């Protein structure tokens, strides 16, 4: 049974370490218009995720931004949509790596039950969050493009976007931090 506790401790350690690692990743690595983060044709601008009813259950999952004050909040003002778009890429990357690294649980607890624990851990703790990021990103990109167009004609309105086309001249360090 102590193999179970080692696997559980390993999973907990992955979860705890995921936040500081995600915060430390350079934001310039994450462009929502490039693979693997760009919306694929089969995703139909995020509409394919409506079949999974993500809108209904996404707010019921734990939100780490409530526990970690330095995390980007799930809900930001419309004035800063690109920051949130970028964070969806970071979150997707971190959760994908958590799936890969969680294979270590299978070596710590060699049991048929370890496969079940691994599957539940990844479906609830990682795949669901990846789906939420893939669902939200196209919607947030449309909001960012709308904001860009709205600000284009008004030189006195402060835009949080770096150029007329999101990420065309993009530098992560130029994004505002809220």
Region annotations inferred by a language model:
Residues 1-40, 90-108:
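Long, highly hydrophobic alpha-helical transmembrane signal-anchor segments
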Residues 22-36, 129-144:
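Inner-leaflet juxtamembrane helices
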Residues 29-84, 146-159, 164-166:
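Membrane-proximal soluble regions of multi-pass membrane proteins
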Residues 76-98:
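Loop-to-transmembrane boundary segments
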Residues 94-138:
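Hydrophobic transmembrane alpha-helices
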Residues 130-178:
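Cytosolic/matrix-facing juxtamembrane and C-terminal tails of multi-pass cellular membrane proteins
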């Amino acid at each position: 049974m102590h193999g179970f506790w080692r696997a559980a401790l390993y999973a907990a350690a992955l979860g705890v370490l995921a936040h500081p690692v995600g915060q430390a990743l350079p934001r310039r690595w994450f462009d929502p218009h490039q693979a693997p983060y760009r919306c694929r044709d089969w995703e139909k601008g995020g509409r394919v995720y409506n079949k999974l009813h993500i809108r209904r259950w996404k707010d019921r999952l734990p939100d780490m931004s409530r526990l970690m004050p330095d995390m980007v909040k799930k809900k930001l003002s419309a004035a800063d949509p690109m920051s949130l778009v970028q964070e969806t890429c970071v979150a997707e990357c971190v959760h994908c790596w958590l799936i890969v690294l969680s294979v270590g649980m299978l070596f710590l607890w060699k049991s048929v039950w370890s496969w079940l624990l691994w599957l539940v851990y990844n479906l609830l703790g990682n795949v669901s969050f990846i789906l939420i990021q893939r669902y939200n990103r196209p919607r947030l990109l449309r909001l960012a493009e709308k904001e860009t167009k709205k600000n284009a004609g008004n030189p006195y309105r402060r835009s949080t976007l770096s150029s007329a086309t999101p990420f065309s001249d993009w530098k992560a360090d130029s994004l505002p931090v809220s």
